[in-house]
């Protein structure tokens, strides 16, 4: 509620419907959600339509972020990125592409699935 504007992109249509319903039920009017593939939606045109953001929270699928999405993020020079990942290997690959523009300032692994090999890893990146 305190943010000026929140834009959500989700690949699962049902999750977008649920998010829109939740926002409506909670009288939150500063959000907009779009369903689709991030690499197709997150473009210069998308950014010009929605404006430049001061924070990106990304939680890509196991394959990680598409290189075109990373290129758009680098062009934006968003001050902070919170990168949540269920695959530390692809997260590491993506962070390698971001390292010239962003510093890793915090890392927090989270064991959401005890007694399995799965771990969520959260990284805070800040613009250099």
Task: Map each language-model feature to its residues.
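Rossmann-like S-adenosyl-L-methionine
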Residues: 1-128
């Amino acid at each position: 509620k305190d943010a000026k504007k929140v834009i959500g992109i989700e690949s699962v249509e049902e999750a977008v419907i649920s998010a829109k319903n939740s926002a409506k039920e909670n009288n939150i009017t500063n959000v907009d959600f779009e369903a689709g593939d991030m690499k197709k939606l997150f473009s210069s045109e998308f950014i010009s339509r929605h404006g430049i953001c001061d924070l990106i929270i990304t939680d890509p699928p196991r394959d990680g972020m598409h290189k075109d999405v990373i290129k758009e993020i680098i062009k934006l020079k968003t001050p902070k990125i919170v990168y949540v990942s269920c695959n530390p290997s692809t997260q590491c690959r993506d962070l390698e592409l971001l390292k010239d523009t962003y510093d890793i300032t915090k890392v927090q692994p989270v064991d959401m699935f005890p007694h399995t090999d799965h771990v969520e890893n959260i990284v805070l990146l800040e613009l250099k």
